[in-house]
């Protein structure tokens, strides 16, 4: 290969990378503003009336129902923050941490169901799930640091142990159960109520703002933690930031994807984008594009064929990943 050929390929790659970033920003920023307005309850009623009329003109009235907009809004934010946080998780070789946090959050849901049912309070399970998710993530770090268990052993212990605790708590709760636990295991569009939408909107905006503010430091710590420590960065603090953001994203996404599948949105879009990306930044933008495509296509399939949205979303994401593998190996 001549120097001219190499330069031409490099320029072509930079052009493709710039195109992905421009497309993501061109469609992503207006969509983020729109879904933020919906999540905050600021979207004018005329928007929903017009959407209903357009849908009716095409023979469907699904756009007339609130649950559809709730699911789309939560899904849009899942497709955004899952890959954003997941990019740092995957490149730090922590792919299984999302699965562990999800199972720890399940224990929190079980605990919250037991406690709230016993005392008769009508409160959200989000706080219980978030606390146990963070405890599970910290538990993995502590086991890795203070025991001889290496590799994925601490992850496997916390993953299995937290899920087992959840099962035991559900059995102990018996008649105190106040929610359909299957909706948390597999996801359910019908439980994405207005409160869930508001929580996910706030969570997503907070995560995006935090990652944006600490982007350079997180990037440094991700690729060279030793050099980052020498440079004076508090690596442990940024590790905790990534773990905390992962916990928040996992718990916020459980309502639509379910505990079993929620970790997929942290890993699969990033893995797909990584097959064709040549830089961290392009992988980040590409993973968001894959995540949003998987969410909207998956929801469309779920509503068309009456299947669970979490499974449909992940199936689409895996399909995109396999296509990216085929393209990347050419």
What feature does the model see in each segment?
Residues 29-33, 103-113, 157-169, 235-248, ...:
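Small-residue-rich segments of transmembrane alpha-helices in multi-pass membrane proteins
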Residues 72-76, 126-131, 153-157, 197-202, ...:
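Hydrophobic alpha-helical transmembrane segments
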Residues 1-77:
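Membrane-interfacial amphipathic/re-entrant helices at transmembrane-helix boundaries
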Residues 44-64, 120, 175-194, 301:
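Membrane-interface helix termini and inter-helical loops of multi-pass transporters
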Residues 66-80, 122-134, 201-205, 252-265, ...:
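Structural signature of hydrophobic alpha-helical transmembrane segments
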Residues 57, 155-159, 163-212:
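Transmembrane helix-bundle core of multi-pass membrane transporters
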Residues 87-176, 273-286, 302-309, 328-329:
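Short loop segments and helix-boundary regions at transmembrane helix junctions
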Residues 198-269:
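Helix-loop-helix "hairpin" substructures at the membrane interface of multi-pass membrane proteins
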């Amino acid at each position: 290969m001549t120097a001219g050929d190499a330069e031409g390929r490099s320029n072509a790659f930079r052009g493709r990378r710039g195109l992905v970033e421009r497309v993501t920003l061109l469609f992503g920023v207006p969509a983020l503003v729109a879904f933020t307005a919906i999540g905050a309850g600021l979207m004018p009623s005329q928007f929903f009336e017009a959407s209903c009329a357009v849908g009716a003109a095409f023979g469907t009235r699904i756009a007339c129902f609130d649950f559809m907009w709730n699911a789309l809004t939560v899904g849009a934010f899942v497709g955004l923050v899952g890959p954003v946080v997941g990019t740092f998780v995957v490149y730090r070789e922590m792919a299984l941490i999302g699965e562990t946090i999800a199972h720890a959050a399940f224990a929190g849901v079980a605990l919250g169901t037991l406690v709230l049912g016993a005392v008769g309070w009508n409160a959200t399970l989000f706080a219980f799930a978030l606390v146990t998710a963070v405890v599970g993530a910290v538990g993995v770090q502590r086991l890795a640091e203070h025991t001889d268990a290496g590799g994925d052993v601490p992850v496997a212990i916390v993953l299995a142990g937290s899920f087992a605790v959840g099962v035991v708590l559900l059995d102990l709760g018996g008649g105190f159960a106040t929610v359909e636990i299957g909706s948390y295991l597999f996801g359910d569009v019908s439980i994405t109520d207005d409160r869930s939408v508001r929580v996910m909107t706030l969570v997503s905006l907070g995560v995006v703002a935090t990652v944006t503010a600490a982007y350079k430091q997180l990037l440094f710590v991700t690729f060279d933690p030793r050099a980052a420590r020498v440079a004076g960065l508090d690596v442990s603090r940024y590790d905790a930031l990534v773990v905390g953001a992962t916990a928040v994203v996992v718990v916020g996404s459980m309502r639509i994807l379910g505990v079993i599948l929620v970790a997929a949105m942290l890993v699969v879009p990033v893995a797909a984008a990584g097959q064709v990306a040549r830089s961290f930044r392009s992988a980040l933008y590409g993973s968001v594009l894959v995540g949003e495509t998987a969410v909207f296509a998956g929801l469309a399939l779920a509503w068309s064929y009456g299947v669970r949205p979490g499974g449909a979303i992940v199936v689409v994401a895996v399909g995109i990943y396999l296509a990216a593998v085929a393209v990347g190996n050419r």
